[in-house]
UniProtKB/Swiss-Prot annotation:
One of its GO terms (cellular component) is membrane. The keyword Transcription regulation does not apply. It comes from the Eukaryota. The chain crosses the membrane at residues 108-128, 145-165, 172-192, 208-228, 245-265, 272-292, 336-356. Disruption phenotype: Abnormal spore maturation in presence of cw27-encoded poison. Sensitises cells to cw27-encoded poison; simultaneous disruption of cw9 enhances sensitivity. GO terms for biological process: meiotic drive. Keywords: Cytoplasm, Endoplasmic reticulum, Membrane, Toxin, Transmembrane, Transmembrane helix, Vacuole. The lineage of its organism: Eukaryota, Fungi, Dikarya, Ascomycota, Taphrinomycotina. It holds the Pfam family WTF. Residues 1-42, 74-103 are annotated as: Disordered. Belongs to the WTF family. This is Meiotic driver cw27. The gene is cw27. It comes from Schizosaccharomyces pombe (Fission yeast).
Length: 375
């Protein structure tokens, strides 16, 4: 009778069956292990001798491809511990020795300082009010001391809350501050865009606006001078004489809005030149009024104010419309004055030469005159 030998499966075959019968596509299906001849080896083991446990440990290590950084899948780390002399398996037992928990809380002094600051801010208005009324711990009755006790209890509660919930309310304050900063940033950007749009619009109509404002200021000054003339408005001489300066400042403000920043320096230089011309015109008007003051129906400061106002604003508008007019006018005036002074100097020099020549003729000796007559 033939002996029937049933194929036996190794523990590795049973383990593979547990793992959903995974088949390696490179090595094919799992072969059966024949315990009689030992020719068929356990699955996926190369040169495995079951009699040598050392070689079996090496083969198992190769089977799972262990290295020092990985652990075998589907195994508990604490259940499978295989050691080998030549091939070091991974250390599956890991011990976490914590040196100590890190304390994220704020330092004691900072926590105390910030918590105490809230009490100061809470009590400062009341203390300032009592000091202002001069009633700080003076003539206190039962009601006043009751209020003081309630106030102290409230301060103690606030301090305790600030101390115990320090991390919470400081985080809330930080979030609130960041939110407010973002709101301010967005608002500032929106306002900047609005101002830019308005500035571009004003710059496009700057000439019309300058003329309109100049006409309105002219009407206001005429009404002002009319009221002063009729006696219904009593203004001193300094205010009337500074009308041109007020108008120049008004135009400077308007020009700083209507004119871009890169042309503001030109506006400032033009205004300074206008004010210089104001001074010259004021001197001329005062000189004329001192000579012919009796022939003017208006008082002198009214005439001076009108002249300065019209000339100043006319020159300022002209400078805004045609840059460099005042500079050319200054150069022209300087050339004219130089020409006049040069002519006067030449005339004076000619007169001096004529007088000097006459004196030289008078100094000629009589002997020379006789020689000249004989010749």
């Amino acid at each position: 009778m033939k002996n029937k030998y049933y194929p036996l499966r190794s523990s590795m075959d049973e383990l593979s069956t547990k793992n959903d019968n995974e088949i390696d596509l490179e090595k094919g299906p799992l072969p059966e292990y024949n315990s009689e001849d030992g020719s068929t080896l356990p699955p996926y083991s190369e040169n495995l001798n079951l009699k040598d446990p050392k070689q079996m440990g090496q083969s198992i290590t190769k089977l799972f491809n262990w290295n020092k950084s990985t652990t075998p899948p589907d195994y508990d780390e604490n259940r499978l511990l295989i050691t080998d002399e030549g091939n070091n398996p991974p250390n599956t037992h890991r011990e976490n020795h914590s040196s100590g928990t890190t304390d994220n809380s704020s330092p004691f002094l900072i926590k105390l300082l910030i918590s105490f600051t809230s009490i100061i801010l809470f009590n400062a208005p009341a203390v300032c009010y009592l000091k202002y009324k001069d009633a700080f711990f003076k003539n206190y009755g039962a009601a006043e001391w009751t209020l003081i006790g309630f106030w102290c209890a409230s301060s103690l509660i606030i301090f305790t809350f600030s101390w115990c919930f320090y991390e919470t309310w400081t985080k809330a304050v930080k979030v609130t501050v960041i939110f407010l900063a973002q709101c301010i940033k967005v608002t500032a950007i929106s306002l900047a865009k609005c101002v830019k749009v308005i500035s571009i619009g004003l710059f496009n109509i700057r000439r019309e606006m300058m003329i309109i404002i100049w006409i309105l200021w002219l009407i206001i000054c005429c009404i002002l001078f009319g009221c002063v003339k009729d006696g219904r408005l009593n203004l001193n001489k300094a205010l009337i004489c500074s009308t041109c300066t007020i108008s120049a400042v008004l135009f400077l403000i308007v020009s700083s809005v209507c004119i871009p920043i890169w042309t503001l320096w030109r506006a400032l230089s033009g205004m300074l030149q206008v004010l210089g011309i104001h001074g010259i015109i004021a001197l001329l008007v005062n000189g004329l009024m001192s000579l012919f003051g009796k022939h003017f129906g208006w008082r002198g400061y009214e005439i001076e104010g009108f002249v300065l106002f019209f000339t100043g604003n006319a020159l300022f508008l002209y400078e805004m419309e045609r840059p460099g007019v005042l500079k050319r006018m200054r150069n022209t005036t300087r050339n004219v004055i130089g020409f006049i002074l040069g002519g006067i100097a030449n005339a004076i020099g000619g007169i001096a030469n004529a007088i000097g020549g006459a004196n030289d003729n008078n100094d000629i000796p009589l002997g020379e005159l006789e020689v000249e007559s004989e010749v």
